C-alpha cells in the first residue's frame, strides 16, 4: 500500500518538474537564439 501511495506522488512530481523545465529550456534557447541572430 505504501508503494502505491508513493508512486503516484513521484509521477506527479516528475511531470511537474518536466512541465516546468521544458518551457524554461525552450525559453532560454529562444532568447539565446534571438541574441545570436541580432549579432
UniProtKB/Swiss-Prot annotation:
The chain crosses the membrane at residues 14-30. It is found in: Plastid, Chloroplast thylakoid membrane. It is a single-pass membrane protein. The keyword Iron applies. With its partner (PsbE) binds heme. PSII binds additional chlorophylls, carotenoids and specific lipids. It holds the Pfam family Cytochrom_B559. Its cofactor is heme b. PROSITE patterns: CYTOCHROME_B559 (PS00537). One of its GO terms (molecular function) is heme binding. InterPro entries: PSII_cyt_b559_bsu (IPR006241), PSII_cyt_b559_CS (IPR006216), PSII_cyt_b559_N (IPR013081). Heme binds at residue 18. Keywords: Chloroplast, Electron transport, Heme, Iron, Membrane, Metal-binding, Photosynthesis, Photosystem II, Plastid, Thylakoid, Transmembrane, Transmembrane helix, Transport. The keyword Iron applies. GO terms for biological process: photosynthetic electron transport chain. GO terms for cellular component: chloroplast thylakoid membrane; photosystem II reaction center. Belongs to the PsbE/PsbF family. This b-type cytochrome is tightly associated with the reaction center of photosystem II (PSII). PSII is a light-driven water:plastoquinone oxidoreductase that uses light energy to abstract electrons from H(2)O, generating O(2) and a proton gradient subsequently used for ATP formation. It consists of a core antenna complex that captures photons, and an electron transfer chain that converts photonic excitation into a charge separation. Heterodimer of an alpha subunit and a beta subunit. PSII is composed of 1 copy each of membrane proteins PsbA, PsbB, PsbC, PsbD, PsbE, PsbF, PsbH, PsbI, PsbJ, PsbK, PsbL, PsbM, PsbT, PsbX, PsbY, PsbZ, Psb30/Ycf12, at least 3 peripheral proteins of the oxygen-evolving complex and a large number of cofactors. It forms dimeric complexes. This is Cytochrome b559 subunit beta. It comes from Beta vulgaris. The lineage of its organism: Eukaryota, Viridiplantae, Streptophyta, Embryophyta, Tracheophyta.
Amino acid at each position: 500500500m505504501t508503494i502505491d501511495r508513493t508512486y503516484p506522488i513521484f509521477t506527479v512530481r516528475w511531470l511537474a518538474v518536466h512541465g516546468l523545465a521544458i518551457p524554461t529550456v525552450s525559453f532560454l534557447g529562444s532568447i539565446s537564439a534571438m541574441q545570436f541572430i541580432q549579432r
